[in-house]
Amino acid sequence: MPELPEVETALRGISPYLKNFTIEKVVVRQPKLRWAVSEELITLKNVKIVDLTRRAKYLIIHTEKGYIIGHLGMSGSVRIVPQDSAIDKHDHIDIVVNNGKLLRYNDPRRFGAWLWTENLDDFHLFLKLGPEPLSDEFNAEYLFKKSRQKSTALKTFLMDNAVVVGVGNIYANESLFICGIHPLKLAKNLTRNQCYSLVNTIKDVLRKAIIQGGTTLKDFLQPDGRPGYFAQELLVYGNKDKPCPKCGGKIESLIIGQRNSFFCPKCQKRG
C-alpha cells in the first residue's frame, strides 16, 4: 500500500507536468473504484490546474473550479505518459492536459478513489484527520496529550489518522524500533521523553523515505517508472528471523490490528 512518502513522491513527480496546464478532458474507463468516480470529474473539460498538494495520503489537484481528490488505495499508481501511449491492463483513468501528456491512474485492486469537491474545508474525508507528521503541529507535547487515557497498542495509536496522518505500517515499525519501544506498549504509558524521541524519529524516517523516493515492496513505482529505494534501508520491517541490526538477536513478528508488526524483543522491551 502506498504510504505518505510514496504519495509525496508521486506528487512531486507529476506536478511539473500538470501545474499551470489545462485539463482537456478526463477519460474514465472504470468508474467503480472504492467509491464511484465523481460525476463532476467525468465531465470535467477545459479547466486550468493551478496547484497540486497533498493531505495525508490524498493527492489534491487544485483547479479553477474545484478540487480533484485522488487516493491510490492498496495498489494504485499514477504516471505521466504521452497522450498516444498504449493502454495497459488496469489503466482506469486518464486526466488529459494540453501539453501532449496525460496523468494515468492504474489500480489492479480498485481500492483507490477519484473524487471532486468545490470546498476543501468541508470535504468529508478530511474533517477528522489529524495533523501532518512533518508539520510543527505534530510535536512531543501534542503526542503526549493525545496519548493520555488511550489503552491501545502504541503502534495502532500511531497509525490512527485521527492522531496523526500518514504514519503507515512500514514507518511505524521502523520508528518504534529506532526508539526502542515495543509496539504493544500502551499509548497512555508513553513518557514525555519517549514522545519527544518518537516525534523526531517519525519525522526523520519519513523525510529519508521521501528523499529516496518512497518504499518499493510490491506495487509502488514512481511516476517515471523507477522504483523507490527506501526498502534497502528497512531495519525491521519484513525482516522476521533475521538478525537485529542493533544487538544481533532475532527479529520477531506478530499481528497488531490485523497488520504485521516487526520488532526486536531484546531492544524493544514491553512495558
Swiss-Prot record:
* GO BP annotations listed: base-excision repair
What Pfam families does its record include?
Fapy_DNA_glyco (PF01149), H2TH (PF06831), zf-FPG_IleRS (PF06827)
Arranged from A to Z, the UniProt key words for this protein are: DNA damage, DNA repair, DNA-binding, Glycosidase, Hydrolase, Lyase, Metal-binding, Multifunctional enzyme, Zinc, Zinc-finger
One of the entry's Gene Ontology molecular-function terms is: zinc ion binding
Listed transmembrane segments: none
Known EC number(s)? 3.2.2.23, 4.2.99.18
Annotated active site residues, numbered on this chain, are P2 (schiff-base intermediate with dna), E3 (proton donor), K57 (proton donor), R259 (proton donor)
Q: How is the cofactor bound?
A: Binds 1 zinc ion per subunit.
Presence of the UniProt keyword DNA damage in the record? yes
Zinc finger annotations (FPG-type) as residue ranges: 235-269
Kindly state which reaction or reactions the protein catalyses.
Answer: Hydrolysis of DNA containing ring-opened 7-methylguanine residues, releasing 2,6-diamino-4-hydroxy-5-(N-methyl)formamidopyrimidine; 2'-deoxyribonucleotide-(2'-deoxyribose 5'-phosphate)-2'-deoxyribonucleotide-DNA = a 3'-end 2'-deoxyribonucleotide-(2,3-dehydro-2,3-deoxyribose 5'-phosphate)-DNA + a 5'-end 5'-phospho-2'-deoxyribonucleoside-DNA + H(+)
Q: Detail which positions bind DNA.
A: H90, R109, K150
Lineage: superkingdom: Bacteria
Q: Which cofactor does it need?
A: Zn(2+)
To which protein family does this belong?
Belongs to the FPG family.
Summarize subunit and interaction data from the UniProt record for this chain.
Answer: Monomer.
Function, as annotated: Involved in base excision repair of DNA damaged by oxidation or by mutagenic agents. Acts as a DNA glycosylase that recognizes and removes damaged bases. Has a preference for oxidized purines, such as 7,8-dihydro-8-oxoguanine (8-oxoG). Has AP (apurinic/apyrimidinic) lyase activity and introduces nicks in the DNA strand. Cleaves the DNA backbone by beta-delta elimination to generate a single-strand break at the site of the removed base with both 3'- and 5'-phosphates.
Q: Which NCBIfam families does the UniProt entry name for this protein?
A: fpg (TIGR00577), PRK01103.1 (NF002211)
What name has this protein been given in UniProt? Formamidopyrimidine-DNA glycosylase
